[in-house]
């Protein structure tokens, strides 16, 4: 449940009002994975969580610290508190920022601190006061997964009842062909109810969901779209989103994965992000240039394309990323910007005449 807390005192009150038994602190490692630990409410201390901080071993978190300088601190953001829809025991989750001990300097490799710093810089320039982001994350839901990497061997196998490669097996004949998964109804779309359960929990946690549907690929490719939000809030929402997706899938004995290209000869999963700058409540990217853009929007796109090689280290960080970035599978393989063309690195969608 969303709590709409703004102060530590609001969080303390929410613990009592909702008979919370545990407080769960969540933070993001360098690879984007959520980490956490939980406190019984008997040991909850408002000052510890929101001012002094709680310590942890940074050398055991990927990409953070070496063993000789391992101690780090977590200080929670009260505005992020929500009642965790995944936990069985009544649990309030709150997202934390990572700090250096003693000096309380923000930790430079904490992804949440990075985006907070970027937002603060944007505001300091006076160019814009808000950046809205609207990611469209895609993922697969597999029925079974097995993999092994041995010293002299390696293997993996994916199982999906709806997959095109199962047409030769006895059972229901409702299979989705390669590239045939975009928008079919049940019984071809076997994941309607699981997606709806995911959306229900996301909404309960405070996320704003616009739509959900089966995606293009066979074997349970899925998309759930969030309503756009300011950049830091959206970063938090996406962590909650992935947390709920993976846990709901696991509850049903399935595995959800956001890896870019798990299947050969079918579309991979991406997460393109709608972006817009606003100032004083007005959109700065609407104008009279190509595709209804303003000059600022064109310059903004130019900056992305100029630095696209460096951005790939963040946007396409694994070797599997490049298995997706090939022609013929609706992946952005051209360093260009274009209206409607899904092969362009920057696409201007044509869906409405509204400047918003």
Description of each model-found segment:
Residues 2-356:
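Glycine-rich, acidic/polar active-site loops that bind/position phosphate-bearing ligands
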